From Swiss-Prot:
Free-text function comment from the UniProt entry: Converts heme B (protoheme IX) to heme O by substitution of the vinyl group on carbon 2 of heme B porphyrin ring with a hydroxyethyl farnesyl side group.
Domain of life: Bacteria
The enzyme's E.C. designation: 2.5.1.141
Main subcellular location: membrane
Species of the source: Vesicomyosocius okutanii subsp. Calyptogena okutanii (strain HA)
Catalytically driven reaction(s): heme b + (2E,6E)-farnesyl diphosphate + H2O = Fe(II)-heme o + diphosphate
Chain segments annotated as transmembrane: 15-35, 39-59, 91-111, 112-132, 139-159, 166-186, 220-240, 265-285
GO MF assignments: protoheme IX farnesyltransferase activity
Protein name: Protoheme IX farnesyltransferase
Amino acid sequence: MPLISDLLALCKLKVVALILFTAVVGMFLAVPAPYLPNGLLVLSASIGISMVAASAAVFNHVVDEQIDAQMSRTNQRPLPQGRVSKNQALVWGVFLGFIGLGILQLFVNIITVVLTFISLIGYTIVYTLYLKRATPQNIVIGGAAGATPPVLGWTAVSGTQGIEYACLLFLIVFIWTPPHFWALAIYRVEEYKKIDMPMLPVTHGLAYTRTQILLYTVLLLLVSLLPYLSGMSGLIYLVITIALGVRFLVYAIKIYNNPDDKMVAWSTFMYSINYLMLLFIALLFDHYWLISPWEIL
């Protein structure tokens, strides 16, 4: 029997935590201030979305077992080390996905079930099985699956009401994904070359990738203004998102100007995670900041 710690390692809990965070923010933004979403609904949706996200991570481990065994970043994972068999991982992944979708069906709503299932298929089959090995645009196209959590959170609480605002959150995460992963790909480019993975730095070179990171970061700065321009968010969000975006742009320029410095790429990758978290915190803070605690209660 595999250890619980190994089964949890297959779930990529840190990634799931970021997914859950953006989904929960989507839940709160779906409700007009000063109101809060139903607590049981938030809990049920959070558990269901998290379990399906963990299921997708497990399937990713199964599909990428041979690749993981060849990379220093991943060769200590449970499957390459033989601590969990492929069949055990498959059963674990199916269990998580089935229970997660079941919770969403029983306690949330059908549209969230459908969108979550589409995201699961998009990540595990379209991205992991095909795009990841077929095209250097794998991150761009496959990023759609990873950008859905805020939409899932929104629909869990409000269905399709106001879903156009949820689509703005989707767009932000979608545009954020390429510079986030390409920065990591630059840092790990030699390993990707070793396994012949068609990541952008491998197929098109570092210079082209650095340019794409810069262009996508500029686009992200512009797209992040849409919640303000659409009336979804206010000045507090606008100020914070501009500050975060300019800082991200500084990192992108550093990558562009320092082609041989892998640590700049790593620093950019790490900042991109903080960027997304802080941007969603800004959305939430702006949503409630004029409301007194007594109004919320």
